[in-house]
């Protein structure tokens, strides 16, 4: 199973879910760029709310878009728990682009 953009993962050694933000071309090598989904942070311009009902329970919190991390999934166990629709992913994508908008 390969992780894809918009997937919410549970990864061994990480206590919170993460969302895959890297594109599928990059993800094909087994590495991903992710942002954490955290419960105890306030919403703001870079903390986007998320609520997903999964077979294993509910994921609710904020995506911390400023906490971008690289993970090598070839070296970690992980489980895909949910996949966002592309329309739901657009706010995340827009926020990440805005963080790196060089002028």
Predicted regions and their residues:
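Conserved functional hotspots at enzyme active or ligand-binding sites that engage polyanionic ligands
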Residues: 1-103
